Amino acid sequence: LDELEKKARAREEELASIPSVKPVRLDHLQRDVQHLSGYGIRLHPVHKVNKMHHGIDFTAPEGTSIQATGDGRVVEVENKKSGYGRSVTIDHGYGFKTLYAHMAQIKVRKGQKVKKGEVIGTIGNSGTSTGPHCHYEVHLYGKPVNPIHYCMDGLSPQEYQEMVEKAEMANQSFD
């Protein structure tokens, strides 16, 4: 029984660590997801060239809370004038890392442990950005993957499919 309990706890820890919620709570997002720029080749709004967009841009009012999408440890905190601006990277273990960029405020520090749903910062417009949003990336074993597959929380299958379609249709990122 002890071995079974140990395996169950380990599986529970793994599931809590894998990114599985959106970085911006559902009640703070525009529900119709009209302003969502997805993963893939996009027109860069500043440089005006087609470029790979390795994340999803979630728009919300400046100052809106950004949450950790899984348990993990903060491995990088940056404050740059260009690029991702104020950003946080979390290592979730199991090969997963997530990046949250263009923040107004960062509320965590490097080395800090965080839990899924914990506020790590606020929506901003820092770095190379054209408006307030959270640029969110998921990396698996060092390679960017489409974050849309890790954003199903709180959505019906129809709402999830609509979000996927909107993200794929957008041809310009916000960063």
Question: What are the functions of these language-model segments?
Answer:
Residues D27-F174:
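Catalytic cores of peptidoglycan-degrading enzymes
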Residues L1-Q34:
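Non-catalytic extracellular/periplasmic "stalk"
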